[in-house]
Every structure is written in C-alpha cells, then in structure tokens.
Amino acid sequence: MRIHLDTNLLIRKPRWELLPPGSHEYLVSALVFAEFSEGTAHPDPDIAAQARIDLIQHRSTYGDGLPFTQREADIYRELCSIVTTAGRTPGGKRRVDLMIAAVAIGDGAALATRNTSDFDGLQPLLHIITL
C-alpha cells in the first residue's frame, strides 16, 4: 500500500503498529517538507538547529517530496468544493491540509496522520489512516 505521511508524522514518530498488515511504501509530498521547514526558522536556535537536522534525515529517508502539479491543483479545487458544501471554509491552515490530501489522491495513495479531523469529509476520495 502506498501511504503518504502528513507533516505531524514527521514531527512525532508514527505509531507504525497501527498500520494494517502488509507491505507499505511511505511517501512525503513537497508540501509536507515545506510545512515541516517552518521549524527551521524557530526563534530558539537549538530548536531551529534540530529541525534542520531532522529535515535532512527525513529527506534522506523519504527522498524528494512529490510535487503539487496542475493535476493536484484540479483535485484541490474539487476538495475545496466538498469542504464548502459541508459548510466549512477551505482557506487558512486547512488550505495546506487540502493540498497535501490532493497530492495523496493524485498518487492513488492513502494518507496517514495523527489529526484525522483535518481531513474530515474527504473520506469518499481519500483513505485516511490514523497513526
């Protein structure tokens, strides 16, 4: 199973034991790496330095992040429509979550996260795994 990791799983170690049995390929989008990179600008120099080290390790583990292309932009538009129809706003912090979801959907992959509520309403299009 192809599984995209949400940013929060790079911040805190995933609970791999919660995964369904089988072999899995773990992927990260460039958007997740971008969101994770916010920590490298932390005002505390020790936290920023650790974030830089962690980013290098994650890039080494997961490779280049999958891109957000026109295809994913079209999927994002559909996700915005779903969210709006449900009475929620697709903007703000939710924007990046929807873009991360669009990359996973475009790749035909599941999305693993700690914060399933960030992706409420997308389940018809996206298999979400709580870790």
Language model feature labels by segment:
Residues I105:
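Anion (oxyanion) recognition and catalysis
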Residues S117:
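Flexible glycine-rich beta->alpha loop in the catalytic core of nucleotide-sugar glycosyltransferases
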Residues R114:
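Conserved acidic donor-binding loop of glycosyltransferase catalytic domains
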Residues I3, K13-A102, D120-T130:
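PIN-domain endoribonuclease scaffold, especially VapC-family toxins
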